[in-house]
Amino acid sequence: HLVEHGVKKIFVGVGGSATNDGGIGMAAGLGYEFFDENNHRLRPVGSSLGRVARISAERVPTFLNNIGIEILTDVSNPLCGQQGATQIFGRQKGLSEWLLSSVDQEMRKFYELANPQILTQAGAGAGGGMAAGLVTFAKGKVVSGIDTCLDLLDFDRRVKEADLVVVGEGRMDKQSLAGKAPVGIARRTPKEIPVLAICGSLADDLPPFPRENIQAAFPIISQVADLDVTLAQARENLVRTARNIGNLLDI
């Protein structure tokens, strides 16, 4: 559909997914077919990864060669291994502890067949391996998500007119400082412009601020309460916190 309307470049944001299939489902949507050692066609799901013996591109449309795909992600995790997609993010997607190692091994086996070079590429593990799939099956290129968005917004020019930059995060933790959006914005902000973070909560593993050009971080939650109550009070808590910060800056 996009090609029919003349689109030549596509940005694909990858991250925060509920999938961990190495991008095999996406590849099937593009026309790729996967077969086992007996030449039986496999379902394009994560549980098939370790059984793939042959990949067919006969039904893949040729127009894919004429489209530039940029894969936007702000994680640097490789596809497999201790820092890979499955070991780091598999638990939060519902994988049982005893399955992590076998799923990781099956994903590695699949890409040893499909594209061995992807196993060493930073960011390939984003989206449960979706980034690896887009590189391998759609000739995509992994780029910094936050930097690409800031470039599209002409951030570097606009920020020069700012007196203060405020970034946000649902829960700021050590992982947030590894290159997620708030830090990406802070790094692109001139040193003379202060950057403050307003967050839902702050994790115990956060190092002291200033850090990564963020001068201070403020949680909006003011009391211990049930999640439903906390969510219902989000607007009120955010406004109160922002007002208090404004009053402090006005001293």
Per-region residue spans from a language model:
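N-terminal loops that bind phosphate or other acidic moieties
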Residues: 1-14, 18-251
